[in-house]
Swiss-Prot record:
Superkingdom in the source lineage: Eukaryota
Transmembrane segments: 372-392
Protein name: Tyrosine-protein phosphatase non-receptor type substrate 1
Segments of this protein annotated with the region Disordered: 136-159, 344-364, 402-468, 480-506
Organism: Bos taurus (Bovine)
Keyword check for rRNA processing: no
Cellular localization per UniProt: Membrane
Disulfide bonds: C55-C121, C170-C228, C273-C331
Residues covered by the Ig-like V-type domain: 30-145
Length: 506
């Protein structure tokens, strides 16, 4: 059973009402003035984020596109149009394919401080001569809050010594908004800034800051630091940004010299040059002997002190006996390209060393003279020794001669005590051991009958082979044997008695 259809007469009034309502709405939209609505007067985003700019219209009439611009006037910057070439960073918020779409909001990604400015949503009307600007929205001010760049510190271009004042400069840029604070510190102690400026002074998309402070250097500043701290709203209460400068790149601590001498083995003297508390460690040390360069050494081994400075020690061994006069030793140091500094040590030579020339390193002539002196000395010593030996031997011989020499005494003892008679021919020889007393020999009596010769033969022991000596014979006694005296009527001829002494020589 089919449902009952409405009567044709009843539908006609309903259709008329719908057409009337439709005509009324269309007339309102078409005849009313088009409005371009930008609800946000200002939008603030951080650099690197995405900004959304809203724009809607109240009517699609007149026919024409919607375009976005930054700024006003002839120099305004074209930002976006749906029907134009694509824009990498700008996209449409609404669905562009939707019929009767009246939302023309856009999104700008990866915002930078350069994107800051006033953006306008503008309605154009299509005409024969082209698109003509019809209506513009009030504009939306886009502000970009950008973090400041890390502070950069710069100091003096040349090194300075302690007790000098040097300037340090801190710079940071690219931040927005303009308000920013900057502080200086040295080793945790705040320093006052001598000058600080934020540029530009007028409104701009980003700003930069420049600040200067003065630092008084000290000897212990090798490990010191100068710090610049920057605080900005974009840091959202986090730690401030810091820039650091190490004073080790700025300071130069000149060395102090100490030179001492101490005796070593033999005639050696060890001269020490102590180079203390210098920085940086670029150093060259030279030894001078009486103003003449003796040795140069580039320091390679250092002793680092707690304050960051360095020490170096150099030794110079001197043979004091090689010098007849005082020696001036100079320790000369060139540090970090600066003029050389030096210190002297005078090595005194004692008086005996001044009078002799034995400690000198011998040259060719000195060596010859030394050899000659040695030979002459040895020869003289031998001659003296021989002379002493000769004198000694002569003295011994004289002493022996005095002790062993005695007078040869010939005497004639009594005939009745010891008598030995040998009857021989007229020329017989009698040998006897003689020890004659002093005095004159008795004269033979004239009444002796025989004329004969009597001898005393004395032989001495052979002397030692090594000595040339005279041997004196000690004659104990001589017995002259004669025949008994015969009385004669007349005197007999005289006879002689001899003592024969034989001496053997070498």
């Amino acid at each position: 059973m089919e449902p009952a259809r409405p009567a044709p007469g009843r539908l006609r009034p309903l259709l008329c009402l719908l057409l009337a309502a439709s005509n009324a709405w269309t007339g309102t939209a078409g005849d009313g003035e088009l409005q371009v609505i930008q609800p946000e007067r200002s939008v603030s985003v951080a650099a690197g984020e995405t900004a959304t700019l809203h724009c809607t219209v109240t009517s699609l009439s007149p026919v024409g596109p919607i375009k976005w611009f930054k700024g006003t006037g002839p120099g305004r910057e074209f930002i976006y149009s749906q029907k134009e070439a694509p824009f990498p960073r700008v996209t449409n918020v609404s669905d562009a394919t939707k019929r009767n779409n009246m939302d023309f909001s856009i999104r700008i990604s990866n915002i930078t401080p350069a994107d800051a400015g006033v953006y306008y949503c503008v309605k154009f009307r299509k005409e024969e001569r082209g698109d003509m600007e019809f209506k513009s929205g009030p504009g939306t001010h886009l502000t970009v809050s950008a973090k400041p760049s890390p502070p950069v510190l710069s100091g003096p271009t040349v090194r300075a010594t302690p007790e000098q004042t040097v300037n340090f400069t801190c710079t940071s840029h690219g931040f927005s908004p303009r308000n920013i604070s900057l502080k200086w510190f040295k080793n945790g102690n705040e320093l006052s800034a001598s000058q600080t400026s934020v540029d530009p002074e007028d409104n701009n998309v980003s700003y930069s800051i420049n600040s200067t402070t003065k630092v008084l250097l000290a000897t212990g500043d090798v490990h010191s630091q100068v710090i610049c701290e920057v605080a900005h709203v974009t840091l959202q209460g986090g730690p401030p940004l810091r820039g650091t400068a190490n004073l080790s790149e700025t300071i130069r601590v000149p060395p102090t010299l100490e030179i001492t001498g101490s005796p070593s083995a033999g005639n050696q003297v060890n001269v020490t040059c102590q180079v203390n508390k210098f920085y940086p460690r670029h150093l060259q040390l030279t030894w001078l002997e009486n103003g003449n360069m003796s040795r140069t050494e580039a320091a390679s081994v250092f002793v680092e002190n707690k304050d960051g400075t360095f020490n170096q020690t150099s030794w110079f061994l001197v043979n004091s006996s090689a010098h007849r006069e005082a020696v001036v030793l100079t320790c000369q140091v060139e540090h970090d390209g600066q003029p050389a500094v030096s210190k002297n040590h005078t090595l005194e030579v004692s008086a005996p060393q001044k009078d002799q020339d034995t400690g000198q390193t011998p040259g060719p002539n000195d060596s010859n003279w030394t050899s000659i002196f040695i030979v002459v000395g040895v020869v003289c010593a031998l001659l003296v020794a021989l002379l002493i030996a000769a004198l000694y031997l002569l003295r011994i011989r004289q002493n022996k001669a005095k002790g062993s020499t005695s007078s040869t005494r010939l005497h004639e003892p009594e005939k009745n005590t010891r008598e030995t008679t040998q009857i021989q021919d007229n020329n017989d020889i009698t040998y006897a051991d003689l020890n004659l007393p002093k005095g004159k020999k008795s004269t033979p009596k004239a009444n002796e009958p025989n004329n004969h010769t009597e001898y005393a033969s004395i032989q001495a022991r052979p002397p030692p082979v090594s000595e040339d000596t005279l041997t004196y014979a000690d004659l104990d006694m001589v017995h002259l044997n004669r025949t008994p005296k015969q009385p004669a009527p007349k005197p007999e001829p005289s006879y002689s008695e001899y003592a024969s002494v034989q001496v053997q020589r070498k």
